[in-house]
């Protein structure tokens, strides 16, 4: 942040570069849904009151005799302003600079790099990022914030002001009571918002569920003036009770959607939600949502989580990661406990038996929601899987109690249709298994293309046996925990000695035995030439079109996992592969007849070729090219 002007009374500061970019994009991308500014500002006001209520548990003096928390919305036609006021926690000078001048979130730069210039696509991305206070500038060409932090004196208030063009000023101010007033100086074409009926309509649509009263001046018809006139009496324009405390039958889908947008600051509707009251040993209410799009910081393990914790309707914290396991970190919503103490700390949350019960119950509830979506709303589940599938896979290792349920929700690409889209479940695979087949086969690779073109698949394609194509970074980790499904082992086609005996007839088995004996001299010759690079050379039945491939032992780390470990700077053991040769390939016949002078080059070329086909890097590319050119010239 750059400082441009300073004096004892006022400072003019430059917005963080990302804020400038966000303001510009928002004004141009979100204008078609400009009314969200009021939802965002009312939501911020509600959060400020929630935070005061929480801090006042330990510091009752912060309430200063004014314990009735509320939000007020007013407008002034003559001044062309809309004011949103609250008597919540307020802002100190440093908090105003930090919260109204910067975006203190990791991954911000990466987020902006995804923007395309397409208004519709950018609007969705900005919605995932969260617009908050800055949405004011969609309808205002100047915003003034007058705020006094609870516990500070009247003369320690601040006045923040900006036209959204790149700078803001901040100065000391006087304010009689704690809290914040946000004054929007409307743009010239926004007169329709200077209307009590219009503002009430927006508030009831977007903010009816806010648990605090939202008040406006009562208006009566003035026959002389021919218009509505504001009086001194205030009226509450929303229902002012927490949405999650109402009966499900009393809540419309539209109200559920708008509540989601408030708690998540998302621009889009959610994919699904679950609202449930749990009674028994632990009593709590949960209203949990699955978003339609992944947030930009989904893979940031330190990012704030999306579930707000309340205790007896009193807000406690808004990133309580203990309430759901990490693999469900995309879930948004609220959990309201009747059992936890109001002064609960993060340390208590980690040790509380009630919190463990909430965590387990909430995880099961979300999994039930996903199961219902997978079974009854295939299109929605496909959207969910595209956005969050890799995160859900983490659950196979993190949540042993629900591992089987999670396994049933997993989707993969497969040789069945050859498409990159991950649409095949384990149940789909099992339903198509060949008679006599008792294993689920898979291959892992760095990319889908590498997996789909792996030489290890050749015999499976020939026999019509389906293989799952795994190329997500999390897949290898998942497989270390997920060893079977419905009693059927998960088997890598690139590990160990391939055993398809149950699918081979007697004649085929006899031929395999004869071939192994016939090629024994070549195998021994290759083993001697490649003794430093490979553990073993053997004849294989797994190849059809390729001359050779490399495999590792059944209990060894796969080459794909070893590459990932090295790329992450982790120590990775040196694993010598097994070289398998295809006795029916013309190149193997050529090598079989090679002279002793050429044999070493042929053997090295065969191994390097197999390593490249598997996706590995060869140790000496220059030597590979030299050998290849030399053998081509002799051909």
UniProtKB/Swiss-Prot annotation:
Mitochondrion is among the record's keywords: no
Entry-linked PROSITE patterns: HSP90
Keyword set includes Cell cycle: no
Region called C, residue ranges: 564-635
GO CC annotations, alphabetized: cytoplasm
Region feature (B): 347-563
Top-level lineage group: Bacteria
Keyword terms: ATP-binding, Chaperone, Cytoplasm, Nucleotide-binding, Stress response
Assembly mode: Homodimer.
Family: Belongs to the heat shock protein 90 family.
Entry-linked NCBIfam families: PRK05218.1
Name of the protein described by the UniProt record: Chaperone protein HtpG
Species: Bordetella parapertussis (strain 12822 / ATCC BAA-587 / NCTC 13253)
Upper classification of the organism: Bacteria, Pseudomonadati, Pseudomonadota, Betaproteobacteria, Burkholderiales
Gene: htpG
